[in-house]
């Protein structure tokens, strides 16, 4: 739905040259809507001039591109267009090249009000690659290039210094882009364009490069550190963690593939693990911890006991958890605060089932997002868990992909989940009834790779849809799509 004000604004921007000439005459209250319309419709000339002459101290994508009273479209939920993003960056560059006081003129108050450009919060699902849109990797490169060019083009003319602007961004870096981003961060020190990273994601980056990058980041800005595919091990982690721990406002820490053999621990390995635990105790604001594919068997109590504050999001996918790990978590202060829990890849079918149910009971009042992909949950285990699962009254998302469930099990889940009024998404497995010649119990690898009888599954989908309609739950999405934009980020919960 669009209001008359929105439609009028869109009409004004049809002729971009005339709109740019009219900007100084328009009330500043119109600028936020002008920005959203120009960004949406790719009116790049106007968009560039809007950034150049922005009349407020803050230009925030999260404020301007969300659903508003004039337009229900939330652009933050879409990957941004390359043209619009480039126009914003060009407008910033033009603004930095404009001195605070131009020779022979009075200061132009409107032109020089902008102090913070907040480009955080853009969608980066990494799924569909539309050539007309900009990924976070491209955005990082574009902002980094602007920093470097700004520093290289600086001139020291008295009285002509541009007003500094703080640019807040989420940065993505890998081996290929590391040197470029490092140069950009160095260039922003003392520059009119100050680069501030909110969320950092580093993929496949050597340990020394990760440390060098962390040392260049502003300790007051960083909210999340996400290290992926780095295979740090305990030794590498013990080198990196003190550099991460200096970010006292860090709310989210995502570490993966931290290996250490708990069955045959070495002296060095134990020393590294103790040092890691000591550093983890320095965080005062941590709310999300992800340790996916890390060997934590029998060690979860040591890890979580060091934290100063309770977690709201905990991801322990493929961590080989033992029953005692789940029992400790259920009794800990973290359980009653959890909004998001990911136990994917941990076998919950045997002796882990009872402590897992206890954990669900403890987290029932707060849990919003539960991920149980590839947990070896068959009908028997699911049915035994349903009474406590349905007590999670606030649950919005349930992920069960890769579990050996039958059509009968899915039917029972659908019927019992009717009491969960907040539930919006269920990612379920292909029922075992739809496979041909499936071994029992089927390994997760077989469920992921074996062929599906498409005709049988189409009938199952139709039946589930009819059951949803009959129960008045047509708004709940039941899907087998694990790659869609369904799993919520902790900060969006």
Swiss-Prot record:
Which Pfam families is this protein grouped with? LRR_6
Molecular function GO terms recorded: kinase binding
Query: LRR repeat boundaries?
Result: 111-146, 194-218, 219-246, 247-282, 283-307, 308-339, 340-360, 364-391, 392-416
- Quote the subcellular location field of this record: Cytoplasm
User: Keyword Cytoplasm: yes or no?
Assistant: yes
Q: Enumerate the Gene Ontology biological process terms.
A: negative regulation of NF-kappaB transcription factor activity; negative regulation of toll-like receptor signaling pathway
Q: What is this protein called?
A: Leucine-rich repeat-containing protein 14
Q: How does it assemble?
A: Interacts with IKBKB; disrupts IKBKB-IKBKG interaction preventing I-kappa-B-kinase (IKK) core complex formation and leading to a decrease of IKBKB phosphorylation and NF-kappaB activation. Interacts with CHUK.
Q: Which PANTHER family has this protein been placed in?
A: LEUCINE-RICH REPEAT-CONTAINING PROTEIN 14, SIMILAR TO PREFERENTIALLY EXPRESSED ANTIGEN IN MELANOMA-LIKE 3
Query: Which InterPro entries does this entry report, sorted A to Z?
Result: Leu-rich_rpt, LRR_dom_sf, PRAME_domain
Per UniProt, which keywords does this protein have? Cytoplasm, Leucine-rich repeat, Repeat
| Originating organism | Bos taurus
Gene Ontology terms, cellular component aspect? cytoplasm
């Amino acid at each position: 739905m669009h209001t008359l004000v929105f439609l009028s604004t869109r009409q004004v921007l049809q002729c971009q040259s005339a709109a740019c000439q009219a900007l100084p005459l328009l009330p500043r209250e119109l600028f936020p809507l002008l920005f959203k319309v120009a960004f949406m419709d790719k009116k790049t000339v106007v968009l560039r001039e809007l950034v150049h002459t922005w009349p407020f101290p803050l230009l925030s994508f999260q404020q301007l591109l969300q659903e508003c009273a004039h337009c229900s479209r939330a652009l933050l939920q879409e990957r941004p267009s390359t043209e619009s993003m480039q126009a914003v960056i060009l407008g910033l560059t033009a603004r930095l090249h404009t001195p605070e006081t131009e020779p022979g003129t009075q200061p132009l108050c409107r032109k020089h009000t902008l102090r913070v450009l907040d480009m955080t919060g853009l969608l980066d699902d990494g799924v569909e690659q539309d050539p007309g849109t900009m990924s976070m990797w491209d955005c990082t490169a574009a902002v980094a290039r602007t920093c470097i060019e700004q520093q290289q083009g600086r001139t020291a003319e008295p009285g002509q210094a541009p007003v500094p602007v703080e640019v807040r961004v989420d940065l993505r870096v890998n081996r290929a882009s590391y040197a470029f981003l490092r140069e950009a961060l160095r260039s922003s020190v003392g520059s009119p364009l100050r680069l501030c990273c909110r969320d950092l994601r580093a993929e496949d980056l050597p340990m020394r490069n990760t440390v060098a990058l962390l040392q260049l980041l502003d300790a007051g800005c960083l909210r999340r550190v996400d290290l992926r595919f780095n295979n740090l091990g305990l030794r590498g982690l013990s080198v990196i963690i003190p550099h991460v721990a200096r970010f006292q406002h860090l709310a989210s820490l995502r570490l993966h593939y931290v290996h250490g053999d708990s069955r045959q621990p070495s002296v060095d390995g134990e020393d590294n693990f103790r040092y890691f635990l000591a550093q983890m105790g320095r965080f005062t604001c941590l709310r999300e911890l992800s340790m996916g594919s890390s060997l934590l068997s029998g060690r979860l109590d040591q890890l979580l006991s060091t934290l100063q504050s309770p977690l709201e999001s905990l991801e322990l996918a493929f961590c080989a958890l033992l029953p005692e790990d789940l029992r400790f978590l259920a009794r800990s202060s973290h359980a009653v605060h959890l909004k998001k829990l990911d136990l994917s890849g941990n076998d919950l079918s045997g002796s882990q089932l009872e402590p897992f149910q206890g954990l669900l009971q403890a987290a029932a009042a707060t849990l919003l997002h539960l991920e149980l992909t590839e947990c070896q949950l068959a009908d028997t285990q699911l049915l035994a868990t349903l009474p406590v699962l349905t007590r999670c009254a606030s649950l919005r998302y349930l992920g069960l992909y890769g579990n050996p469930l039958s059509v009968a099990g899915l039917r029972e889940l659908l019927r019992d989940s009717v009491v969960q009024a907040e539930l919006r998404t269920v990612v379920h497995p292909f029922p075992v009834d739809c496979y041909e010649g499936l071994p029992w119990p089927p390994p997760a690898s077989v469920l992921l790779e074996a062929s599906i009888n498409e005709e049988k599954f189409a009938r199952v989908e139709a039946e589930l849809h009819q059951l949803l309609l009959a129960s008045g739950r047509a708004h709940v999405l039941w899907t087998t799509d694990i790659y869609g934009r369904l799993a919520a980020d902790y900060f969006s919960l």
